[in-house]
Regions:
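Hydrophobic residues within beta-strands of alpha/beta enzymes
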Residues: 1-2, 65-66
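Active-site-adjacent beta->alpha loops and helix N-cap segments on the catalytic face
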Residues: 4-25, 71-80
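Conserved functional loop/turn residues at catalytic and ligand-binding sites
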Residues: 61, 69
Length: 80
């Protein structure tokens, strides 16, 4: 497991091919708070920013992602 997730996209990518075990990323509470606060201030579109952050983790090699946005992200993906 790699945490915090977003600052270590390069680590996720490097680990991806080195081990034959599932790789998980944990989007910690600080990352959640950062996105939530910026969205509340109108600085970004919460849905787009959150989904992009999760897609970035997946592209970097995470096979599973633990996030405080899990329920919202599931709803957003279902609506898409």
């Amino acid at each position: 497991m790699v945490k915090p997730a977003l600052p270590y996209l390069d680590v996720l990518s490097a680990l991806k091919g080195r081990f034959a075990k599932p790789l998980f990323a944990y989007q910690v509470s600080g990352e959640y708070a950062m996105l939530k606060a910026a969205a509340l201030k109108g600085w970004l579109d919460e849905r787009r920013a959150v989904l992009e952050s999760l897609f970035a983790l997946r592209r970097a090699g995470a096979q599973g992602i633990l996030t405080y946005y899990a329920l919202e992200a599931a709803r957003w993906l279902k609506e898409a």
